[in-house]
């Protein structure tokens, strides 16, 4: 049975005359086996905020694209990356000519309508990528355009029972051969010092910016950790052209790499003009009936655990604490919910994982069932609650829920807030009174 704050306060106020030792429950071992004793629900307030200052430097996936979400509006992603030489001081032979150039982008995932046409553009970066920290709001100046095309990607990594692979594992973009003739092949003889080391090359060539068109309805994720993440230059020279034997080469190959280790970052914007909720009008006094989670810094849920303040000197021992976060039924049919969430404690501008993570997993995995994907996230936060009820008077009663892989995944979810009339988000405590 759900109990509101008043009931919780009355239940604990009975023992408020007993002096607290200041070490409430700290010697207990966390675990659901300790969910015994009296159960009570703690009052809280929930609302939604944007996540400021999301670091997107060297993310697990680089993103391009956008889509119109009827609830969250339109998120848009692009990325900038350095390129490095596959070998220094390349020798392209006599009279080399670039035949073609392709940028290979290994798929890591996608979100949205994969049957829709997708516009994508590749440009040389006019901004050097330094050792600075890059955020979602960081930008890079785009220079000369190397590719601007629209097509329907055939992304897929499924393998049928027959062993036949469906779809392509990478996106291939044809870049301007004339530009790479000038910048790489001709430079190998006209200005060889820029190719003598990767340090010299990075001073010479800032990198690439990859972005999407304004009407895309998909966001694609690409894996910089894949060995096939590269720009591949196909070329011929006098020797290759003169060899007409069947065993002879048709072309030479040289690669510029954008694999893990180079500087790269995601650039993110959110247009919430068509969103179904307003971040500027959140009820932070009473809380909201629906709250929101969105990757790429789009939305996070803030919890104020007001009910715990009244319990600090109760003298009761909290054996187990569970946070239950229901997902709005039917909200994740078209757009997938995150596989997991994390819980942060918020102290001023500082955001850190709660102490329960020091002992391993606290849960937070999404479990759903039924046609409408009904489910919830569940967290064991016993140690954090014990800390808040202990002597640490500097503890903050604010927590934050964030999606996993927030810098590289757009997954989102609609959650039940504390003001939901049927199944609100809840913090349940199991407690006992020491003799």
Model regions: which residues?
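Secreted, disulfide-rich extracellular signaling modules
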Residues: 2-435
